Amino acid sequence: MGTVYINNVVKQMKTDLRLIQEQQPLIHNITNYVAMNFVANSLLAIGASPIMARAEEEVEEISSKSNALALNLGVPESTTAHSMILAGEAAMKKRIPIVFDVVGVGATRFRMDIASQIILRCHPTVIKGNASEIQALYSHQIGMLGVDSHQETYEVEEQAKKLAKQLSCIIVVTGAIDFITDGERMAYVHEGHSMMSKVTAMGCTATGIVGAFLAVNSDPLEASFHAMKAMGIAGERAASQSRGNGSMMINFLDELCNLMADD
């Protein structure tokens, strides 16, 4: 196993961003209601084309025409879960990359059951969660009290590696330092700011951004690494000029728009 050391990671991230701007990939998001507006605006900010369809009557058709699918467990409902599975199976058949955010997966048996079905039937390309969510998914233990992790990322690195191998996917563990692995390779993202955790939908936005990078980069670990790097850089820059949560949200969108500005 080895850590991914990339001297020109920002340059490579910008190569992906340039491809996103040129190709304007269609990213199908089935995310929670709280996050939909911010996720869509963030994807537009980097040049992607978001669509937020969730009706089971159309999700298969839309996913089949999309360049990536982003699924989110944030506000689980039986109808939404069914839509996610239908969309995921359609994407899988077309070999369209899928990123699945296992929000609060350890909080209830309902969430764990939905997550297990999506993983079993849709085989996500990337699974994303904070430390406690990834630990819960690995152990199938219920009892996590919230969706914010108070564990350090390093505590679940070994579990993330094992889970990545077991599920043949990329695992993204978010935290003060983000950890990305395919079970063999590892990458760390040190950028970011604590203010990001005070703005709702930041995590859901990261999931959508990962989807956009997956649409243009065929290496899912590299795509996830670059996406989280972009989130972190934009977050740091936004925080440096923000007075509170409101300005942080607006500044973050502006900084996503301006990630290519220093070229």
Regions found by a protein language model. Give the residues of each.
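Charged C-terminal helix
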Residues: 8-11, 233-263
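Conserved phosphate/ATP/ADP-binding segment of small-molecule kinases
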Residues: 112-186
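Glycine/small-residue-rich loop that forms an oxyanion/phosphate-binding "nest" at active or ligand-binding sites
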Residues: 72, 80-129
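Short pre-catalytic strand/loop immediately N-terminal to key active-site residues, enriched for Gly-Thr
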Residues: 161, 189-200
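Glycine-rich phosphate/adenosyl-contacting loop at the front of the ribokinase-like
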Residues: 1-49
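Short, well-structured alpha-helical segments that form the helix of a local strand-helix-strand
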Residues: 159-164, 220-235, 253
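Short, small-residue alpha-helix embedded
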Residues: 136, 200-229
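Acidic-glycine-rich active-site phosphate/pyrophosphate-binding loop
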Residues: 5-18, 169-191, 263
